[in-house]
A protein has these predicted regions:
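Helix-to-loop junction immediately C-terminal to a conserved catalytic motif
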Residues: 48
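Conserved ABC transporter NBD signature motif
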Residues: 56-66
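ABC ATPase NBD coupling module
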Residues: 65-80, 182
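Conserved ABC ATPase "signature" region
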Residues: 109-126
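Conserved ABC ATPase signature
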Residues: 131-135, 139
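Hydrophobic anchor residue at the start of the ABC signature
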Residues: 145
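Catalytic Walker B motif of ABC-type/P-loop ATPase nucleotide-binding domains
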Residues: 156-159
Length: 206
């Protein structure tokens, strides 16, 4: 479980988030919506330990006030992230990008696992040799999801993961995110798309 207790955040002396509270359990599917500037991404970043709150606390599976080393360990082992801009290395191959999720996994057939991940996102094995910049936006986000599949994270934080996609690819990508949730992973996602927000089992409106 992840617990946020009265977390607050200010930028340039302007309060953006005040005393926000939430409990996130495994298998939760939580959406966050709100107007620009309401702090949606700020909340996501604090929950995902990408930035600390100014006050309050984020408790990760019973541990509070994690130091830098502990935070990095949690991010590596338990957390996964999806971003609107895909966060892939554009001049590297799909294989190289997927391998990032397998760096710490020893004694496994990495190529076989990569093929399994591509199958999960409905891309064929020929994509392993393609450069990221050769792919469409929808294909890039599917590669990012394949990397999450390989990482085996318990909690996924997604910031506008379908924001740059057309309707067809939006539905494909969001369907894959739902499949990750069905595998037992908690998903917290920011979206401007009300239709997608309504598919959550908990909808936070800022």
């Amino acid at each position: 479980m992840i617990q946020a207790n009265n977390i607050s955040k200010s930028y340039n002396n302007e309060l953006v988030i005040e005393k926000f509270n939430i409990d996130i359990n495994k298998k939760d599917f939580i959406s966050i919506t709100g107007e620009s500037g309401k702090g949606k991404t700020t909340i996501l970043n604090m929950l995902g330990l990408l930035e600390p709150p100014d006050s309050g606390e984020v408790i990760v599976e019973g541990k509070v006030n994690l130091n830098r080393k502990e935070t990095m360990m949690v991010q590596r082992k338990k957390f996964g992230y999806l971003f609107q801009n895909y966060a892939l290395i554009e001049n590297e191959t799909v294989e190289a990008n997927l391998n990032i999720a397998l760096i710490y996994r020893k004694g496994v057939n990495k190529k076989s696992l990569m093929k399994e991940a591509l199958h999960f996102v409905n891309l064929n094995n020929s994509f392993l040799g393609k450069k990221i910049y050769q792919l469409s936006g929808g294909e890039q986000q599917r590669v990012a999801i394949a990397r999450l599949f390989l990482k085996e994270a318990d909690y996924i934080f997604a910031d506008e993961p379908t924001g740059n996609l057309d309707m067809k690819n939006r539905d494909i990508v969001f369907g894959l995110i739902q499949k990750l949730n069905e595998m037992g992973k908690a998903v917290v996602y920011v979206t401007h798309d009300i239709e997608l927000a309504e598919r959550a089992n908990q909808w936070i409106k800022l």
